[in-house]
Structures are given as structure tokens and as C-alpha cells.
Amino acid sequence: ITRDPKELAEAVREVLEQGSINLYMFHGGTNFGFMNGCSARGTLDLPQVTSYDYDALLDEEGNPTAKYLAVKKMMATHFPEYPQLEPLYKESMELDAIPLVEKVSLFETLDSLSSPVESLYPKKMEELGQSYGYLLYRTETNWDAEEERLRIIDGRDRAQLYVDGQWVKTQYQTEIGEDIFYQGKKKALSRLDILVENMGRVNYGHKFLAD
């Protein structure tokens, strides 16, 4: 979400000549954890990034931007009775690349992360007292043919399919429900895992109070 600095400064001037104003956002910031939010666009949901900079007058580090300087210049010209102070700039440093030297497998650490819930049917995240993050659905199945056609129904927002711990397919909300073809061994018992991720909850608009 961006706006031309000069155009914004002129809009702020017009408002201040009539009254007061509250700039949103004035200071960029960051949402933490899974609280990033999501925009609703018709039938499509667009998860937002964790950054909450939003092209604000001050960036996420608190440093002034071109937009801040444009509004500051406008204020000095049209409202000279208000004193102007020079903004402060925080020092920053460039970090070198950090090599990844260790990793763990999700499937090898499940017992340490959570406890299983057994059910005859797949339960929704909310039915399990969870509103954000990930759910792993697991079952065992026999393949009736060497090539099986699978479908994930009504999942959101991203689903990753694994067979015996091996990744098979990743689908996003617009792809979920499409056929997934898997080459397996006929009658062989396999473990089927579907990792579902909630990528962000709608935080405004017509879907805000929807089921």
C-alpha cells in the first residue's frame, strides 16, 4: 500500500486547514507470531506479510522516509508558527549470510511439539481450540492401484501432502480441491500426512464475522 509523498502532503494540508488529522499508519511496525492478518478480495483471501510498514511516514526502524520529509516541508511552509526539529536517524549495520548447519524433521519431533487427537473425521482447527498456525492430519491407507487420485476438500490456506514422510504436493487455497496423482504400490499400507497452514485470519471487511 503506497502513496505519493507530495500527494499525501497536499492531502494532509487540506485536512489541517479544516481541522485535525490522525495518520494511519504514521509509524511502521511489525506483527509477531501468526498475527499478520489477511485481506478479503471476493472469494480470494490474501494473507498479509508480518511487516506492518504500510509505507508509513516512519519506517519499521523509526527512521523518517521521503513521505515524512514531504509532510515536514509542507508543515514548515503552511504552518510556520509550529517549530520544526530535525529528525533522528538510527544507525544500522549489514549482516553477513548466516549458514544453516543444523535442522530437524517435523515428523521426528511431533511428540515434542504436540499431542495427537484421534477422531473418526477431520476436525477443524477451531474445534481443537486452535486459531492459528498448523495442523497435521494423519491416517493410514491401502492403495487400490499403482496410481491413485487424491483430493483435499475445503482446506485453507495451504496444504502439503506427504506419503510415508515424503513430500508429494503443495496446494494453496485456489488449488485445494484439484486432483493429486500419486504413484504408489498397489495394496501397500502407507502413512498419509496432510499439513494444513492457516496463513492469516481476515481482520476487516465483509468476511470479518463470517463462519
What are these language model-derived features?
Residues E14-G19, L23-D211:
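Carbohydrate-binding surfaces of carbohydrate-active enzymes
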Residues I1-I21:
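Catalytic-core regions of glycoside hydrolase
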